[in-house]
Design a protein with these regions (language model features):
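Short, well-structured alpha-helical segments
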Residues: 23-31, 44, 68, 107-115
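Short runs of predominantly hydrophobic/aromatic residues within well-ordered alpha helices
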Residues: 27, 47, 64-69, 110, ...
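Histidine- and acidic-residue-rich, metal-dependent catalytic cores
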Residues: 33, 89-121
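Short, flexible active-site-proximal loops enriched in glycine and acidic residues
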Residues: 60-66, 82-85, 102-106
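Divalent metal-dependent phosphate-bond-processing catalytic cores, especially two-metal-ion Mg2+/Mn2+ enzymes
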Residues: 1-16, 35-42, 52-61, 73, ...
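His-Asp-centered metal-binding catalytic motifs of divalent-metal-dependent phosphohydrolases/nucleases
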Residues: 50, 64-80, 89, 112-118
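Active-site metal-coordination segments of metallo-dependent hydrolases
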Residues: 36-46, 78-91
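An amphipathic alpha-helix signature
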Residues: 7, 11, 27-28, 51, ...
Length: 206
């Protein structure tokens, strides 16, 4: 996604909430976070891919501005040694929305959307379903991009010994494969489900 497209998405998201976009400092700080050196997958590449999906499918959202901002913040805090990244990112999102003058209800909904990216429960509501489907769209990517994604994830956890890391990674992929459906929205299910299952099966068998 081009810098111009990122800027346009950012401004449109705030406008949809009925508030002016904060000055560029917040957006640039988020982009700086996604460029941190410990990241290999959870980068501006991932954020740009997510926002590109959102731009194409935003008609599926009930509150599109909130979904877009949840995407911007969903990996804002990313420490591979921590277990509260989503909670910290969600708290930052809520604080940013409150500071910009968004309603308390909107801030809480965005907080909940970011927390849903823990992928530990079935998403509830159209916006959560769309957000999670977009976050998981990489599983249904073309083979070359999926394989790149797997390399990127392994690079982020390169400090974990391979004999521990590989079985853990297979177990995570197995859990996605075991779901009755990986994607909740009919649109993304139709576009990505079959290829996601092919990618997961191939990676698990490797």
């Amino acid at each position: 996604m081009t810098p111009q497209a990122l800027h346009a998405n950012w401004n449109a998201a705030w406008q949809a909430l009925g508030v002016a976009a904060p000055d560029d400092a917040l957006r640039l700080e988020l982009q700086r976070r996604y460029g941190e050196p410990q990241r290999h997958y959870h980068t501006m590449q991932h954020l740009g891919e997510c926002l590109a999906w959102f731009d194409r499918e935003q008609a599926l959202a009930e509150r599109p501005g909130e979904v877009a901002l949840a995407l911007w913040f969903h990996d804002a805090i990313y420490d591979v040694h921590a277990h509260d990244n989503e909670a910290c990112s969600a708290d930052w999102a809520r604080q940013a929305l409150q500071a910009a003058g968004a309603s308390g209800a909107a801030a809480e909904r965005v907080h909940a959307l970011v927390m849903a990216t823990r992928h530990d429960a079935v998403p509830e509501g159209r916006d959560a379903e769309l957000l999670i489907d977009i976050d998981l769209s990489i599983l249904g990517a073309e083979r070359a991009r999926f394989d790149e994604y797997e390399r990127q994830v392994h690079a982020e956890y390169g400090f974990v010994p391979e004999e521990i890391r590989l079985p853990r990674r297979r177990a995570i992929l197995q859990r996605f494969l075991a779901r009755p459906a990986i994607y909740a929205t009919p649109r993304l299910h139709a576009l990505l489900e079959a290829r996601a299952r092919e990618n997961l099966q191939r990676s698990i068998a490797a």
